[in-house]
């Protein structure tokens, strides 16, 4: 199974190693047991922002990097338009290749993925609600 994980939760790259938010990494260990390949579609952080992280303990085949964005001010709303458009295209291309689509909600990126997944009626999908959403 080709698993695609779409999330606003970042992959953190430190010293050439990939990390995830620690509880998220434990959850993904379960998914990794049932997937032949795992692809992430999410933001990538290149520095430690004091998030509780753990090294990824399974093979990640690829990461489609998405730009983080928020809509908390007028200027951010204007900036979000091109970011969202590019994200929609990247999410669509990633979904085309996947056998199973896993949305990790809430978040702006998962919201976009919810819209795109409508086009893939025959693909298996799951959604995980992982906490509060503060756009």
Predicted feature descriptions by range:
Residues 6, 41, 66, 128-130:
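Generic beta-sheet signal
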Residues 37-74:
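N-terminal strand-loop element at the rim of the active site
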Residues 84, 100-121, 127-135:
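An aromatic- and histidine-rich active-site surface loop
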Residues 1-52:
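N-terminal subdomain of nucleotide-sugar transferases
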Residues 10-15, 71-75, 128-135:
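A short, histidine- and acid-enriched strand-loop-helix "catalytic/donor-clamping" loop
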Residues 11-12, 77-100:
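Conserved nucleotide-sugar donor-binding subdomain of glycosyltransferases
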Residues 19-23, 82-83, 134-135:
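Nucleotide-sugar donor phosphate/pyrophosphate-binding loop at the beta->alpha transition
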Residues 35, 60, 97-99:
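Short, well-ordered alpha-helix to beta-strand connector turns
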């Amino acid at each position: 199974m080709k698993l695609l994980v779409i999330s606003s939760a970042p992959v953190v790259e430190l010293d050439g190693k990939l990390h995830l938010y620690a509880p998220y990494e434990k959850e993904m260990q379960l998914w990794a047991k049932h997937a032949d390949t795992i692809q992430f579609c999410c933001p990538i952080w290149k520095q430690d922002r004091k998030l509780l992280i753990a090294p990824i303990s399974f093979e990640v085949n690829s990461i489609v990097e998405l730009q983080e964005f928020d809509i908390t001010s007028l200027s951010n709303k204007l900036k979000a338009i091109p970011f969202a458009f590019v994200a929609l295209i990247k999410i669509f291309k990633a979904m085309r290749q996947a056998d199973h689509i896993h949305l990790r909600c809430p978040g702006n990126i998962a919201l976009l993925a919810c819209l795109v997944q409508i086009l893939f009626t025959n693909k298996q999908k799951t959604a995980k609600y992982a906490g509060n959403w503060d756009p």
